[in-house]
Amino acid sequence: MSFTVAIIGRPNVGKSTLFNRLVGKKLALVDDTPGVTRDRRPGDAKLVDLKFRIIDTAGLEESSPDSLQGRMWAQTEAAIDEADLSLFVVDAKAGLTPADQTLAEMLRRRGKPVVVVANKSEARGSEGGFYDAFTLGLGEPCPISAEHGQGMLDLRDAIVAALGEERAFPPAEDVAETNVDIRPVAGEGTEDEEVEPAYDETKPLRVAIVGRPNAGKSTLINRFLGEDRLLTGPEAGITRDSISVEWDWRGRTIKMFDTAGMRRKAKVQEKLEKLSVADALRAIRFAETVVIVFDATIPFEKQDLQIVDLVLREGRAAVLAFNKWDLVENWQALLVDLREKTERLLPQARGIRAVPISGHTGYGLDRLMQAIIETDKVWNRRISTARLNRWLESQQVQHPPPAVSGRRLKLKYMTQVKARPPGFMISCTRPEAVPESYTRYLINGLRNDFDLPGVPIRVHFRASENPFESKARKRR
């Protein structure tokens, strides 16, 4: 990206709507409730012939530095300092407020290029607010409607004028373009029945951080990044949007998604919280590995178990992180207790990796990252057809399929049809009659014999073809 733009403004002027318009996706939550956005959200924007990095920020109101609003202000100031240009969004329909004047003064002190964006200019009676924006002393305002996409060409011209042609259109680098699929399926399409493809350790890894409110998810990500990138504090439910951040771990790009705390469905009443939870679910589906953060001082609440079950039903690789380990006194006894409860309460994820950590002190973070990588390897694993059929034969010798209605089931052939998560197809007689207990027996055997701990395993059955049936039809 050639340059970076920060979107600045008081609450509810349409900053996130403009952000979504420029990135071409609904990445940021949008609602009539003021203060929806709290963290900095980056994205890749395109405006006519301009391509740039854009940062959505929290709506700013003056408050004490220690308050939540004060910490949000500090995050927005960091975005302004990082950016080459600020889009200062005002509400042309509602007109200017003292908060707009305060923000204008702050931007003037920064001394960086600013474009005043008079949003909602399509509304009746917005002319007064548009002309008032001249009094901010930051140049001619650009009238737009972020919701309807009006005025985007004028906004493009205003950005180029503020930055200058050279900064807006830097010379193209002489680098060959490469089309890279960010979601390759390891080993998909491999024909050799004995070949098991190697794990690709170069591709970026997408990791979602989920858990109950106030489990320490944002603190954990800040510790990974080594900076206060995300808002944290004692208040529950600070995070609303799913915010993505990128960093490098031992030469590999990690893209982490911070998500809103997930409460029990019965407690989620407000529309905004429902939107936040839906955003967290999208992050889970987009991720490859999901870290479920537990509060080690009150682990295995019912909601914790429901979140783990949700992640596994979505087919994601899962890792448990027992956070706030620095607050635990008798940690040896707790560790034994957690291991026992993990095996007993999560039978559907037998062998799942669980790591004690502290987002506050940094304890256990290297072990957590190693667990994430190892779990992702398992999630991507493919097993050759030849090995699977030798294994299937041995399983039937040890524990033959049951007889149903006086006829014994026959499992004839097995292959892995997908990875991410591992999925297998078994050809057999009467697939609809295979008992659930025998399916669990096969899944447990696959998990133990092929070292597939902590990931969902899918086993499906299909009817095996009778080679004589088609010949009989022809004779008729």
From Swiss-Prot:
Single GO MF descriptor: GTP binding
GO terms classed as biological process: ribosome biogenesis
KH-like domain: residues covered: 381-465
UniProt keyword Nucleotide-binding present: yes
Residues that hold GTP 1 according to the record: 9-16, 56-60, 119-122
Every EngA-type G domain range: 3-167, 205-380
InterPro entries: G_ENGA, GTP-bd, GTPase_Der, KH_dom-like, KH_dom-like_a/b, P-loop_NTPase, Small_GTP-bd
UniProt family annotation: Belongs to the TRAFAC class TrmE-Era-EngA-EngB-Septin-like GTPase superfamily. EngA (Der) GTPase family.
Protein name: GTPase Der
Organism from which the protein derives: Rhizobium meliloti (strain 1021)
